Amino acid sequence: MVLVGLMHDMGKVLCLFGEPQWAVVGDTFPVGCPYSNKIVYPEFFKFNTDFSIPEYQTQYGIYEKGCGLRNVNMSWGHDEYVYQMLKDHLPEEGLYMLRYHSFYAWHRENEYEYLLDDHDREMLKWVRLFNPYDLYSKNPEPPNWNELRPYYEDLVAKYLPATLKF
């Protein structure tokens, strides 16, 4: 979980390369199915062209009930970017934490139950376990990087290749 904590917002580097903030940060959600009113600012979905596609507004949208989140397309953002970057290198529990830590409608509001399979329900505990370390967990005292650097270098070397593909 420590490596996930280090890497989870790495996808926000997209803002440094011209992506607008709205396309990188914020809650994530499934696409191709009805939007939950538990997603932050749900009133703006009416301006999304997907909102007018009838198939997306059916009970399950383009998905089958219980299809599993691994078969669901999520909105694009920093979570999906870092997940794609690290998906071949981390244990599955960490990958769930990375990919779904901003999917609050699921892990905090219990929405989208119809998409889940048993494996997603098992992995939910890991996403919830990680959540307190995501939001509002900043320490006003900066850590001593010289003391921490060897620990993090060893951790990164254990799981990640010398070069990551962004």
Predicted feature residues:
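Divalent metal-dependent catalytic cores for phosphoryl transfer on phosphate-bearing substrates
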Residues: 1-146
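C-terminal helix/juxtamembrane-tail motif
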Residues: 149-166
